[in-house]
Amino acid sequence: MDKLFLLDAYALIYRSYYAFIKNPRINSKGMNTSAIMGFCNTLHEVMTKEKPTHLGVAFDPHGPTFRNEAYEQYKAQREETPEDIRAAVPIIKDILGAMHIPVLEVAGYEADDVIGTLAKKAGEMGLDTYMLTPDKDYGQLVGGNVKMFRPRHGGGYETLDEEGVKEKYGIDSPLQVIDLLGLMGDSADNIPGCPGVGEKTAVKLINQFGGITALLQRTDELKGALKKKVEENKEQIEFSKFLATIKTDVPIELNLDELKVKEPDEERIIEIFNDLEFKTFIQRFLNKPKPQQKSVSNQLDLFADIPDDGKETIKNGASQSLKTMVHKYELVDKEEDIKKLCDFLITNDFVSFDTETTSTNAIDAELVGLSFSVKEKEAYYVPVSSNREEAEKIVNIFKPLYENEEILKIGQNMKYDIEVLANYGVEVRGKMFDTMIAHYLIQPETRHNMDDMAESYLDYKTIRIEELIGPKGKGQKSMRDLQPSEVYEYAAEDADITLQLKNKLEPELKKRGAYDLFCNIEMPLMPVLAEMEMNGVRIDTQSLKETSRTLTERMHEIEQRIHELAGMEFNIASPKQVGEVLFEKMKIVEKAKKTKTGQYVTNEEVLQSLKGKHEIVADILEHRGLKKLLGTYVDALPKLINPRTGRIHTSFNQTVTATGRLSSSDPNLQNIPVRGEDGKEIRKAFVPEPGCEFFSADYSQIELRVMAHLSGDENMIEAFREGHDIHAATAAKIYKESIDEVSRDQRTKAKRANFGIIYGITVFGLAERLEISRDEAKQLIEGYFENFPKVKEYMDKSIQMARANGYAETLFHRRRYLADINSHNATVRGFAERNAINAPIQGTAADIIKVAMINVYRRFRKEGVKSKMILQVHDELNFSVLPEEKEKVEKIVLEEMQNALKMQVPLVADSGWGKNWLEAH
């Protein structure tokens, strides 16, 4: 039976684009392909599952339509089309052309009207017709053979026939969808509707009167406020009905021969998808056969190959899963077979492995099982007993495998597995390949979990952990609660899919020039971070108690002062109440900024700008700062001490920041305040191991030194080589003074300029930061570039290269992809341009300290140092040091930090010793 599908292009493109908004699909050229990928997925799913005989895709035309001409505000509220969508549309049209699918577009009419006209004609011919769109206004067209095919939230589609539309919207006829939208309006299209009438009221009115026409004739039957609303907005309601009505008389013919589904232009499809880097789409759209995907019994011989039954099937979208994939996953639970498995695995050059445990916290996690894979679609799972002695016996069987330095270890988030195995006396050694970190280097600003990567690279839907242990919450089980027979396929799949991902990601790393960075920095850093996390850091809880008491008393004093200044008591923690006190009662400014909901804006930025208006503002800011310190650090840190180890174990993250810097979490120790007496009190609470001293080493002005090297500016290089105070030297150049004559104020301004200008700060931004006039800020920036001309050249060149390549790159070839670098939107483009300047500097500095950490770790091991590296905070390394190793540790750390990279200027690290972090730094 013939079946016609009509697709609303822009509705689907927008939906696809925003579905990926938090995890955009960026290819190696820096192009955002989210809209194209989502649209192609929808198109392919429709073609393969619904099997239409006829297909057309309708687009809105360039320029205004009859609705715009009738109502200037029509769709005016809709934000400007994102540039990535504008760039995607011609490519989508190219794909449709290569598929021989007609693009339906009529000047002056929207896609709705084109589809409405064609659907009506097709329905009258008796052709089953489906309108694919998420937009509810299409409901008015449904009837007879014409149906809506609507994407559901969360996946899948719903088909709405006449009864379905009536039931969904609570109306008596699909045509009443027009009345529904005419009354309730449509914010997306800026159809005004009747003010104060929502969907429920609109449905009630339609059921009472039958539609807008009768309603407006019988308004005397209405009462109260509703009557007033309707009568005062009669013209607007009628006009809204006009705007909501889809035309069915557009000048376009229904050409079934043209709409008939045809064979695609294979060569063109391959060319387009290769250019987009949609490798799996080539297979999917061209219907290339693949081997039948079939499960293999886990009773096969332990190391037998997967049998080939000669059958073929076609992979469909992301529907590939364990149920449809040929695989051989083995549950290995007998000691004799476990030993055989280890003997077999150890003969391979590589092994993909994973651990199943009782906790996501590696420090406390107990092993539940081990999984391994050395061949795609084959994997093995070994359950581990809850009895510690029995567990160690199983783990020790695999110890020679894990500790074999000749075997490449492959994993996903391997740092976790390294720490778990270390708790059982096993050290994972040799070269490593972590798929999470590999993907981070390829697409740093997206998510790197295995489930997402499997769908993106393998077109495969993994078993979700929630399917085994249930959703997060009190009722969630532990892996220990399940039988090995319930776990083994999930666990084996992890090892197998990780191996498959490695085979996809490795060539991609090489293609993008990131393989050396991956092998020589990110992978060697992983065991360093694992050891630091296991080391943990001790906290002086008594010191924090005293700090808490002092800060709480001070906060209460400030609170009383704020209430006195305000002349009333109010909740200082409530932004709403703060706004009302400052701007209504005290009227500290004539016109205060408000949110869309009418609430006063009282964030830090606003309050900082108002500090000079009244002393209460500074007190409110101080009160907020103290409250945050207490809640985030002073009172929170003692609760995070692990009861078993007596230490805090933060997590150091390699895959979070786009620049390459490490971050830390649970707790975030990177954000502990550096300035101010209160921040110092927190640092005082970080102490070394008993009997040890705290040692801290910090790079001096590393980002400015990197800038000097990258720009090659002779004046900046000279200042660093001669060991001058760079900020005083900068001030001397700008203000044309002798370096000895530079004032404290001049040095401060030069320091702010140094760190601001190299990151593209504007005249306005510098004026705000230094609290000086824009003229003075302008002169300061001009003076800076006059004295450091190659810095300006470097900044301009960085932007040009980013525009040409779509990314910025560090000295170690770490890339930051900048999708908006060529945007027509000046604000968006400006942000990307600042990142083009910033990324190579900040990223290179981040890579330098990573190299230093790796080399310090190796020297400690080689020279038998027992002292521990415990913290990394931006450009600073911290250690707990045995007294007898003080001289040795200081020598190693400073040597490795200062020789991590040879540049045109020296790398300098300052260091200090103390009883705690504060004293040492």
Task: Give the positions of each predicted feature.
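Short alpha-helix plus adjacent loop in nuclease-associated cores
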Residues: 73-87, 143-171, 227-229, 380-397, ...
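Helix-hairpin-helix
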Residues: 185-208, 274-277, 540
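C-terminal polymerase-core module
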Residues: 553, 557-560, 564-618, 786-838, ...
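Conserved catalytic core of nucleic-acid polymerases
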Residues: 477-480, 527, 534, 642-645, ...
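Conserved "right-hand" nucleotidyltransferase catalytic core of DNA-directed polymerases
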Residues: 233-385, 412, 445, 453, ...
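Noncatalytic, basic helical substrate-engagement surface that gates or grips nucleic-acid strands
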Residues: 1-132, 136-163, 236-239, 245-253, ...
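Active-site palm subdomain of RNA-directed nucleic acid polymerases
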Residues: 509-521, 525, 848-873, 877
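Conserved RNase H-like, two-metal-ion catalytic cores of nucleic-acid enzymes
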Residues: 4-5, 15-54, 72-73, 77-84, ...
